[in-house]
Amino acid sequence: MRKMLAAVSRVLAGAAQKPASRVLVASRNFANDATFEIKKCDLHRLEEGPPVTTVLTREDGLKYYRMMQTVRRMELKADQLYKQKIIRGFCHLCDGQEACCVGLEAGINPTDHLITAYRAHGFTFNRGHAVRAILAELTGRRGGCAKGKGGSMHMYAKNFYGGNGIVGAQVPLGAGIALACKYNGKDEVCLTLYGDGAANQGQIFEAYNMAALWKLPCIFICENNRYGMGTSVERAAASTDYYKRGDFIPGLRVDGMDILCVREATKFAAAYCRSGKGPILMELQTYRYHGHSMSDPGVSYRTREEIQEVRSKSDPIMLLKDRMVNSNLASVEELKEIDVEVRKEIEDAAQFATADPEPPLEELGYHIYSSDPPFEVRGANQWIKFKSVS
């Protein structure tokens, strides 16, 4: 009896040292999973599409919430650092579009491939880079994911090919990656992303044709955030049904503000490609809260009321949060704890990104050759020999 009382006393003493919210979360019984209805996708040249119900586990829900919050807070910190002139040059933020980058990653395998345009910070994080490496890249430091030489538009990770600065230029490259997957006999797909503004580029239609001709495992994905720079889709495109643009390629129009919709559509599209049927096209209807880039205030071609309406009615993070709380997958207190942890991670990363040294000037010529060339290469400074991977 004494031993039992002593054990109870130790447990109570330990609980007393923890915040009340943590004790409450630890003692509460949560559901392991829940089933949700999701919006039906519009289909093109498909007899059936992704399911309209899906199961979300508590583990996955917490993971998705943390990932989306991290991307959101990272982008807001980048905005702050840019306004302090610590980050310079081009910078395109993706806050508001978190369900796209996290949902796409949730629907594929780590061995699958992804290439996108210049709004790439979220994808870089989801493909495996730490926040500190991304922010350090934005500030041009040695600890950046491209060693401080790529900046906002040119970040890379394993099976992630950027970050590309030329509008639409990544789409033929994505088709080429899909060709490599098929040529090497690998059960892999390539997610090839572009925006609604780039959707009118001629090279995209050329890539459609080759991918369909050779039945490449390529998922063409149009992130339709309604505006190409400052031009609304209605003013730029004769048809805004981007999921039908492939004509002879099947297509899906997906609610890009709902991570579960994006996840299920991506799984469906990946399975279609892996079955050997060829490419498929996805249009993700989403919205960016910031302007096109940091030089764009974002309110000259749309109203503040429009932005606020999307924030209040369709925010991807709030949608997931409400689902999890209302279905007993998580508590408000638990999600607030994640928010606190994410904010600390972002602040620590920002400190690293401002304190880490810049790369030395001679490193400008590094990483041009895959291996050290057998001859001396002279650049602007004839006494510096360019190196490769060092």
UniProtKB/Swiss-Prot annotation:
Enzyme class: oxidoreductase
Residues modified as N6-acetyllysine: 63, 244, 267, 313, 321, 336
Co-factor requirement: thiamine diphosphate; Mg(2+)
Regulation: Pyruvate dehydrogenase activity is inhibited by phosphorylation of PDHA1; it is reactivated by dephosphorylation.
Keyword Cell membrane assigned: no
Record-level GO BP terms: glucose metabolic process; pyruvate decarboxylation to acetyl-CoA; tricarboxylic acid cycle
Tissue specificity statement from the Swiss-Prot or TrEMBL entry: In all tissues, but in very low amount in testis.
Compartments (UniProt record): Mitochondrion matrix
Transit peptide start and end: 1-29
Record keyword Aminoacyl-tRNA synthetase present: no
Enzyme Commission code: 1.2.4.1
Annotated positions binding thiamine diphosphate: 118-119, 165, 167, 196-198, 225, 292
Modified residues (N6-succinyllysine): 63, 244, 277, 313, 385
Residues the record lists as binding pyruvate: 92, 118-119, 157, 165, 167, 196-198, 225, 227
List of residues binding Mg(2+): 196, 225, 227
Catalytic activity: N(6)-[(R)-lipoyl]-L-lysyl-[protein] + pyruvate + H(+) = N(6)-[(R)-S(8)-acetyldihydrolipoyl]-L-lysyl-[protein] + CO2
Oligomeric and partner information: Heterotetramer of two PDHA1 and two PDHB subunits. The heterotetramer interacts with DLAT, and is part of the multimeric pyruvate dehydrogenase complex that contains multiple copies of pyruvate dehydrogenase (E1), dihydrolipoamide acetyltransferase (DLAT, E2) and lipoamide dehydrogenase (DLD, E3). These subunits are bound to an inner core composed of about 48 DLAT and 12 PDHX molecules.
Protein's UniProt name: Pyruvate dehydrogenase E1 component subunit alpha, somatic form, mitochondrial
Organism whose genome encodes this protein: Rattus norvegicus (Rat)
